[in-house]
Amino acid sequence: GIRTKDGVIYTEAMIRRTDIMNEMIKPGEVFKLAELLPYSEGKIINMDIVHNDKMKFVVMAFDEGTGLTEHAAPGEAIIFALDGEGIISYEGKDHVIKAGENFCFAKGGMHAVKASKRFKMALLLTLE
């Protein structure tokens, strides 16, 4: 099992040889997802970590006041809040999300993301 003083987040993704891993991720090196991208004033920055024809894992950095307009999720998805605070609008209801928290979308779920403060998140998206 896993035991920690402050809790743990465990995510497992099977990476096949046909998957494309971002070259910034080095085998055998420790890294923090939240530190892969900087914040940029007035902008949203994103970077694919790994993807294939069935899934995508992306890290995004939102400057305060930026956001994504409402759209339908192209597949099932999980958001991992990495830093700061954001607002996830899902099916007409707002949900505040902070670093260490997660949120799930169903395929087709209408959602938007707003950064009430600077906000970094990772997104695991199925593409089937």
List where the protein language model places each region.
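Tight coil/turn sites that cap or link beta-strands
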Residues: F62-G65, G100, G108
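A cytosolic small-molecule/anion-sensing beta-strand core signal
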Residues: L82-D83, K98-A99, K117
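A short, N-terminal "cap"/entry segment at the start of jelly-roll beta-barrel domains
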Residues: G7-K54, S89
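Short acidic-glycine-tyrosine-enriched beta hairpin
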Residues: G92-A106
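Ligand-binding loop in jelly-roll beta-barrel domains
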Residues: K107-E128
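Conserved short histidine dyad/triad with adjacent acidic residue
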Residues: K43, K56-A73
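Short, conserved beta-strand element in jelly-roll/cupin
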Residues: A61, P74-I87
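Structural motif
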Residues: E85-I87, D94, M110, K120
